């Protein structure tokens, strides 16, 4: 056996959505900011993403993360997230998983019963709080970047369907649409059709307009499409599934997507500051969200959302790359 690369990871999940934290085998990542570091990874380290996200080591729905030194003087650390299509700008379930793994494995030092973390992400600064007993994390909450409605009631015409979507930012840009527009429910049976519509809507919007953050050039494009539905759980407010990247299905309620959804509900007067919003996902998992404060991003009214969830470690792994293997960089099916 020949080995050219060895990577170590800690894997976890949040409401079924995986996160693979790469703990060994990562070379130096250059850049002063997390956006610059993300750009560096896109240009120089995409092979690492393919090796660890793609089959046979990963799968179409795999999500990953690299923990970096902080980019700002007051942050505790930085994060860079990856998926089946590339490198994302922020990931809410990823924040929940990183904090949980960091505390439960002793990677992060904690004192008392609640710990605050300041995290640099490509989308901006994120503040997270962990509640734990001993080495077991009970929940993680994070204050996300300012989230806002970019455009509302955007008309869409695809095939014989005409409908409207809201476009909102919650760390990445999302199009929000009701699943009933297509006669679909957010469940496993309708998931293939929802995936197809997610791709169509994303491509339609990006062919008609440029979606770009008013302050950060590197934050642009539709990351995902949120399909909203009536909840199944008695305590849930709404049910959703997010289709993002290259048709990837978010098993969790989607942290940045929930932030974008909170922004749309607040803008419409449906959700008030301090009111609890329970977002249910296709696996029946839930995130708790609320509006902490109201602010502005350039000319847009924005909210600072707080999202709460929990994560569980699923494994500790060591992956190798054999240079003789024709599939050593991986492949994707589905």
Swiss-Prot record:
Catalysis: reaction(s): trans-3-hydroxy-L-proline = 1-pyrroline-2-carboxylate + H2O
Top EC class, one word: lyase
Protein name per UniProt: Trans-3-hydroxy-L-proline dehydratase
Binding of substrate, residues: 92-93, 250, 255-256
Keywords associated with the record: Lyase
Record GO terms (molecular function): 4-hydroxyproline epimerase activity; trans-L-3-hydroxyproline dehydratase activity
EC number: 4.2.1.77
Family indicated by similarity: Belongs to the proline racemase family.
Active site residues per record: 91 (proton acceptor)
Pfam families: Pro_racemase (PF05544)
Physiological role: Catalyzes the dehydration of trans-3-hydroxy-L-proline (t3LHyp) to Delta(1)-pyrroline-2-carboxylate (Pyr2C). Is likely involved in a degradation pathway that converts t3LHyp to L-proline. Can also catalyze the epimerization of trans-4-hydroxy-L-proline (t4LHyp) to cis-4-hydroxy-D-proline (c4DHyp) in vitro. Displays no proline racemase activity.
């Amino acid at each position: 056996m020949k080995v050219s690369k060895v990577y170590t990871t800690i894997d976890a999940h949040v409401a079924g959505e995986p996160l693979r934290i790469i703990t060994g085998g990562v070379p130096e990542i250059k850049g002063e900011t997390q956006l610059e570091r993300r750009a560096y990874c896109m240009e120089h380290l995409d092979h690492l993403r393919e090796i660890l996200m793609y089959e046979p080591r990963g799968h179409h729905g795999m999500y990953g993360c690299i923990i970096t030194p902080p980019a700002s003087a007051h942050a505790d650390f930085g994060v860079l997230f990856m998926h089946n299509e590339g490198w994302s700008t922020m990931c809410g379930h990823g924040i929940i998983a990183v904090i949980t793994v960091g505390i439960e494995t002793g990677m992060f030092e904690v004192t008392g019963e609640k710990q605050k973390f300041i995290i640099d992400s490509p989308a901006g600064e994120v503040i997270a709080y962990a509640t734990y007993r001993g080495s077991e994390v009970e929940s993680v909450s994070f204050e996300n970047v300012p989230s806002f409605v970019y455009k509302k009631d955007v008309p869409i015409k695809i095939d014989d369907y005409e409908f409207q979507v809201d476009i909102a930012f919650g760390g990445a840009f999302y199009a929000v649409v009701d699943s009933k527009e297509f006669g679909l429910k957010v469940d496993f049976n309708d998931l293939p059709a929802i995936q197809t519509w997610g791709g169509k809507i994303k491509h339609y919007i990006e062919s008609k307009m440029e979606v770009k953050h008013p302050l950060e050039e590197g934050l642009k494009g539709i990351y995902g499409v949120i399909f909203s539905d009536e909840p199944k759980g008695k305590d849930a407010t709404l049910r959703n599934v997010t289709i993002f990247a290259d048709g990837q299905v978010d098993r969790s309620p989607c942290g940045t997507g929930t932030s974008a959804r909170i922004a749309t509900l607040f803008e419409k007067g449906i959700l008030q500051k301090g009111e609890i919003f329970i977002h249910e996902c296709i696996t029946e998992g839930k995130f708790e969200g609320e509006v902490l404060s109201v602010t502005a991003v350039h000319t847009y009214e924005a909210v600072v959302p707080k999202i709460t969830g929990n994560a569980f470690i699923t494994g500790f792994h060591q992956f190798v790359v054999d240079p003789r293997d024709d599939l050593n960089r991986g492949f994707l099916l589905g």
